[in-house]
């Protein structure tokens, strides 16, 4: 089943507007928080991802960032890592369709579980959550 959001997505109100940036950053430091961003490689050439990166850069209280990336090759993964280099928190670029991940997911087929796709942002989020949970408390 395919789901289309349309032109305007719902952004839930988490009362972030009630916080100033300093208080929000301090609160992040008190509660371990990992942010997960599913990405396609072509999004790195668009202004939105640069804005997201630049907005996250001052958040020293963020525990980590997981980028669930669909990329064609290892050079693209390295470019994504370079794009997020210098952040004040650990950044893990997870190559969702890389050879090691494909091999692992295909091996689960022996258990009669099909977890190989279909590829897309939902599939990337599913994988990224697994990566983010590795360091969860």
What annotation goes with each model-predicted range?
Residues 1-61:
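N-proximal low-complexity "stem/linker" segments adjacent to membrane-targeting elements
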Residues 11-19, 74-136:
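Active-site-proximal specificity loops/subdomain of glycosyltransferases
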Residues 34-36, 64-66, 92:
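A structural signal for isolated positions on well-ordered beta-strands in alpha/beta enzyme cores
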Residues 40, 65, 130-131:
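Broad hydrophobic/π-residue packing in well-ordered secondary structure
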Residues 61-63, 136-137:
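Short, surface-exposed connector motifs at secondary-structure boundaries
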Residues 69-72:
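Acidic ATP/Mg2+-coordinating residue in the GHKL
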């Amino acid at each position: 089943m395919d789901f289309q959001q349309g032109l305007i997505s719902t952004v839930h109100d988490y009362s972030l507007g009630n916080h100033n940036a300093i208080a929000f950053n301090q609160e992040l430091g008190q509660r371990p928080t990992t942010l997960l961003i599913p990405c396609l490689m072509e999004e790195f050439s668009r202004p939105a991802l640069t804005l997201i990166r630049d907005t996250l850069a001052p958040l020293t209280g963020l525990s980590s960032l997981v980028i669930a990336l669909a990329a064609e090759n290892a050079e693209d993964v390295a470019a994504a890592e370079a794009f997020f280099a210098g952040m004040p928190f650990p950044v893990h670029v997870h190559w969702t369709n890389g050879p090691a991940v494909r091999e692992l997911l295909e091996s689960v087929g022996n258990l009669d579980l099909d977890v190989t796709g279909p590829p897309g942002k939902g599939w990337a989020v599913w994988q990224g959550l697994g990566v983010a949970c590795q360091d969860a408390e």
